[in-house]
Structure formats: C-alpha cells, structure tokens
Amino acid sequence: MPPPIGYCPAVGFGGRHERSNAELLAAHVAGDRYAFDQLFRRHHRQLHRLARLTSRTSEDADDALQDAMLSAHRGAGSFRYDAAVSSWLHRIVVNACLDRLRRAKAHPTAPLEDVYPVADRTAQVETAIAVQRALMRLPVEQRAAVVAVDMQGYSIADTARMLGVAEGTVKSRCARARARLARLLGYLNTGVNIRR
C-alpha cells in the first residue's frame, strides 16, 4: 500500500525536506520501499513523453516504459552516481524503446498510415500527427538522438551519455534526422496538403 500523500519516510508528515533523485535512489537501494515509487512519480510524465516519442504506438510506449522501470528498479544498485539519476532513467527508457523497435522491426503489425487515427481535423492536430509520422520514418538511432536533443532539450553530451555513443555520433545522427525531417515536412510551410 502506498504511503499517504504528503508523507516522506525521511521526515514524516509535513516535512520540508524533499529528497533529491540521488537520495531517493540510494534510499531505494537501502530498502526504502517507497523511494522508487516517489522517484518514478516525479519523472513519470517526462519519461512517458520520451517513450511515446521514441515508440511507434502508445501501447509500445507504455510497455517500454514498464520494461524500463522494472529494469531501473532491479538495476538501481549498480548505478554509479557518475551522471544525473534523471539522465540514467532517460537512457534506460530510450534503450527499452529501441529494444522494442528492433524486435518489432522483423514483425511489423500495421502500416504506419494505420497507426494514427485522425479524428480531429484542426491544423494543430494535423501538424502533430505529421511530425509523429515523420519521426517514425527515421531510423531508430536518428530518432532517439533528435528526440532527446530537439524535443527533450538534452545537450549533445547528455544525449551521448544516454545513448552510449560519442558526441560526434549524436551530432551526425541529429543532422541526418533534421535533414530528413525537413524533406518529409517541407510541405507544412507551403500550404500544400499531402495524401493521407
């Protein structure tokens, strides 16, 4: 059973100390049964958004996020504290998404055009769908890099650490992704509608 809202095991009810991500992770490793839940809740929205941007469907994103959180929960003891806990969590989520994409690549379940139903015809919704479709057409490595840098706001260095590649690799993946996105989405600036 989760602790009551406002309860922090370190200080009790009404305490003013909010534990840092590193403190929560260390408390989890030390046996605090509420610490990981608190850490996960703190980052859930951003991690889910990252998973959604890196996955083909919302179901894949949910599954990848669950896989990532189980992996983080189990592997917390091996965290070396040489990077921010949030960067570590993001890397685990990205890796879980990429793993699912690689496994699904051999067995596609639906054509890309069928994945995103378009019920609302407003320009904003159409643009968001077009961008999401264009992202899905990128190779997974390019997509992960450009989502982290351009959509999540991570630096090249942080993205390189999250993805486990060199900074130059992140730069080249982002450049290739941006060039392809510009080609795929160039029609948005012309007022011309593409075939659905």
Curated annotation (Swiss-Prot):
A motif (Interaction with polymerase core subunit RpoC) lies at residues 63-66. SUPFAM superfamilies: Sigma2 domain of RNA polymerase sigma factors, Sigma3 and sigma4 domains of RNA polymerase sigma factors. GO terms for molecular function: DNA binding; sigma factor activity. Residues 39-105 are annotated as: Sigma-70 factor domain-2. Residues 130-181 are annotated as: Sigma-70 factor domain-4. It holds the Pfam family Sigma70_r4_2. Belongs to the sigma-70 factor family. ECF subfamily. This is ECF RNA polymerase sigma factor SigM. It comes from Mycobacterium tuberculosis (strain ATCC 35801 / TMC 107 / Erdman).
